[in-house]
Amino acid sequence: MKKNLLSLFSGCGGMDIGFEGGFKVPKSVLNIKINKDWIEKEDEIYYYLKETIFETKFANDINKYAKIAWNDYFIKKRSSENNETADKEIFKVGSIVDIVKEYQNGNTDVFPQDIEIVTGGFPCQDFSVSGKRKGFDSHKDHNGKRIENNPKNNDNIKTTIPSEETRGKLYMWMKEVIEITKPKIFIAENVKGLTNLGEVEKIIQADFSDIDAKEDKKEGYLVLTKVLHSGMYGVPQSRERIFFIGFKKSALTQKALEELSKTTISEKYTPYPIPTHKLNGEIHTSSLKDLMINFTKSAAVLKDLEEPEKSDDFSQKYYSKAKFMGAHCQGQKEVDLEKLAPTIRAEHHGNIEYRRLSKENGGKINEELEKGYQERRLTLRECARIQTFPDDYNFVIPKKGMKNRFEVSASVGYKLVGNAVPPLLAYHLAKKIESNWELYFGEEIKKTENI
């Protein structure tokens, strides 16, 4: 029996892909000394990961293009699995604020019943190091539009007190959804930069903990926080994110509640996955420390891809043509194939890193330059590989019968892939929670053939 999952701020579905499993990854990203039992099958290039116990029943994002990309992947995936047309209405486009208000105004069917897990990467632009770091003081509304006191008269006048409907406080509406659906567990993701903004992390943790809480503190949610580095889980990228994980206290066994309430949670009870990869020779103390392998180099996921002009894959054909702006600017460096790739960004104003630079601009990949390969930025497929999206996920989707017209363009695709949680990191989280489900909630998981 699958566990029903509700996905918020879903974007193109990186978290959803990981939590459902059943996708393929290049062999180089998996530590088979530790995770061999995750593999359903393999071929020369890929490992096909097993499905998990989770199934997405509701997804939501304000970006209409996210739905197009999400549906393109998931409907195709589910149709092939079930030999029937998948439900096209799982993904609902719109602001989370408007959807919650729709529920509050009487449409109680807006959210599915029997939701056991809620996930969501609430908007990070206001907390990001690469953004303007407005945090709670964001002056954009829940639709991403700038808030003005009187925009008709003066476009420079801003509101003085951001409300809970501003972009920096949309996690409060995720909280509302959790209060409505009452899942056993929820996972909220954001950028590491949030931890450096004063008391923001503690405030968000306290707000989530307050869900359905009573004075005796026996109800509500027990909320944990931890920063995870994607590179420690095989993702060939330097990407750090904070994960808030909340447990419904009344759903936990007494033993699990006691263990999860400790200042230091044991390896057995923690919901956070144990690292499988080393970054730079740092010391690890986990039970798996002797089985860990070195991080996945960028070369491992990039070297086998054809050059764009030779590829039939639209996500490999199209890439940013923004000109080189000088090494002092963001996104003007060449990916070092022997290291982790830099963080794949969502913004697309000439800040997509280079797959290779010319000699004149400091390029160092002589082997490729000598073959006549041209200076260019990372393609969508290369960004997707670095993020561990499966190769059958399309980030550039052409309009049928219309040459050079797109349902999802390359420019949009860069934003989608850069905003996503790496599916492999999400899979590590999902498998840890799956393996501990009975430990936490006392419910035996009935295994199926491919779980």
Protein language model annotation of sequence segments:
Residues 2-87:
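Conserved S-adenosyl-L-methionine
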Residues 99-115, 125, 129-339:
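Class I S-adenosyl-L-methionine
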Residues 94:
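Cofactor-binding loops of NAD(P)H-dependent oxidoreductases
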Residues 307-451:
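C-terminal target-recognition/interaction regions appended to catalytic cores
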Residues 13-14, 65, 123-127, 192-193, ...:
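Short, solvent-exposed loop/turn segments at secondary-structure junctions
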Residues 57, 89, 115-116, 184:
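Conserved acidic residues
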Residues 39-58, 152-165, 368-372:
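Intrinsically disordered, low-complexity acidic Ser/Thr-rich regulatory segments
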Residues 2-5, 57, 239-241, 339-341:
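Extracellular structured ligand-interaction cores
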